[in-house]
Structure formats: structure tokens, C-alpha cells
Amino acid sequence: MTLTQLLQDKPPVRHDVQDRADIRNALSTKGQKLVVVDDDPTGTQTVHGIRVYMDWSIDTLLQALTRPDEVFYISTNSRALPPPEMRALTHELGANLLAASRKLAGETGKNVRLLLASRSDSTLRGHFPEEIDALLSGYGLEADGVILAPALFEAGRYTIDDIHWVDLGDRVVPAAETEFALDPAFGYTKSNLKEWVEEKTKGRWKAEQVLSLSLQTLRLGGVPAAFEILSQAKGGGAHRDQCGHLRGPGNSRSCLDAGGRTGETVRLPMRRLLRESSGWICG
């Protein structure tokens, strides 16, 4: 099967300039910063004009938070680490982000809302869900759900009808049928992301608990329709929101809302983003 055949019955791509403008405006006017935690150095190759930090000391993070940049990356290379070391590193990073934001508030009175994004591999390899758990724990945040959005259009990785696909040139195949799924550290057997979540979490989150944003919903209903579905995600991590075919530049993402006032944990419907498409986003 080709990508064209796979998409032939789908609605046309939705290009809503106003939606993008609203997102940028919200970041710039509401004191929000998107912090992308990147588990592999190759991830920064998909962005430009963005600062990338190689350490996450409180002083470095404080400098990053005081700059006018709306987005910055932190490169950890945690994908190359064994699980215990990854958890310690990611927990420390989350704790330092919280400490830096509190220090900024104490010294300047400025409260910054952090949108934490975890970026990982577009072929579903990485420390999922352990890395998200460690980041949340370090930051002291509970999540109502996770948005899993694996994709990297430039390399031919797409999510359509809940299935993650890899373009091999002459055809597209489910990700679990590729060599990537045989990775000795991060192997998997499921291409349906609902089932993949259950597999990777060892049943902690069941496939039937996963909500799905279809191309039809995104392209025909837009933001209001997506928000209605995402708002159903409640329960401190017991539910998960999986976004089909969502992508911006570079890999996969997950996002969490890190709270309204510095140091507070605020429960919102859409709280944490995972990391596929080479990333997750937590905010």
C-alpha cells in the first residue's frame, strides 16, 4: 500500500493560519515557555533559530527562563542510558526546572508557566513511559493524560487511523513490521498506538482507555473538536490521548501543562504530552 492510497478517503489537509497565530500569541502574551526535553542529539537537527542547552543546572535554566525566547531545547541524550540512569537524570532535570522557576519568581516576581515537551524517536523507540514519569515526578506534577503524536513527515513516519506507518519508498508498512521494532532495547510488536501504549506500559494503561484524535476530527472539526476529546482525559495518568497524524517540524511530541503559578500543580484537562515523532511534550 502507498501513502496516497492510505489517505485517499481522508479529508484535505487543514491550513488554519489563525490557529497558528493564536498559539504563538498565547505563548508570547501569557508568560508561557515551551521547554523541549530531547532524548537524542539528532532531534535538534529538525529545528532552527532555537537555543539548545546541553546542561540543566539551576543557573543555566534560570538564564533560559529569563530570556525572551518562547521555546528552548534541552539535549540530554537519555535514550542512550540504561533505565536507572535515565530516570535519575530526567528526575533531576524536572526538579531543577521547578527550582529555577521558583527562584525566578522569588527574585523578580515573574511567574512563568512551563509547557514541558519530551521529544523522542519517530519510530517508537525510547524510554516510554518511564521518561515521562520521571519528568513529572521531578517537577512535582500529576497529569490527566498524555498526547502521543509520533510522526516525522520528512522521513516518512505517519500516524493514520491509530496505526503508525513507515514509508519505505515503494510502500508504507506498519511500524511493528520494520527493523525498528526489533531494537534490542526498545523493541515492540504493536503498530496500533492504543495497543502499543498497553504493551509499553505493561498493562498500566489499557488500549480501551486511550482516546483517539482522527484525521477527520482534526481536519473537519479543528480546535473545538480536538479540545472536546482532550477534555475527557482525567484521572492523573490513567488515561491517554493519542493524536493521529499530528505533527510539526521534527519527530514526535508530548506536552504537559506545568501549572498556572510557579511551584503549583494545576490540574487541567490536557496535561502532559508524550514523546514520539521523536518527542513528547510535557507542560
Where are these regions (language model features)?
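Short, glycine/acidic-enriched capping/hinge loops at junctions between secondary-structure elements
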Residues: Q45-I50, A64, P83-R87, S252-R253, ...
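N-terminal basic/disordered segments at the start of proteins
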Residues: T2-P68, E154
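Cap/lid and interdomain-hinge subdomains that line or gate substrate/regulatory clefts
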Residues: R24-K33, D38, L61, P68-E70, ...
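Acidic, glycine-rich loop-and-beta core segments that form the ion-binding/anion-interacting portion
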Residues: S254-G283
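Short gly/pro/ser/thr-enriched loop/turn and capping motifs at secondary-structure boundaries
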Residues: G43, F153-R157, L274-E276
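Short loop/turn segments at strand-loop or loop-helix junctions that form parts
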Residues: I74-R79, R271
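Hydrophobic alpha-helical membrane context
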Residues: R51, E131-D133, S254
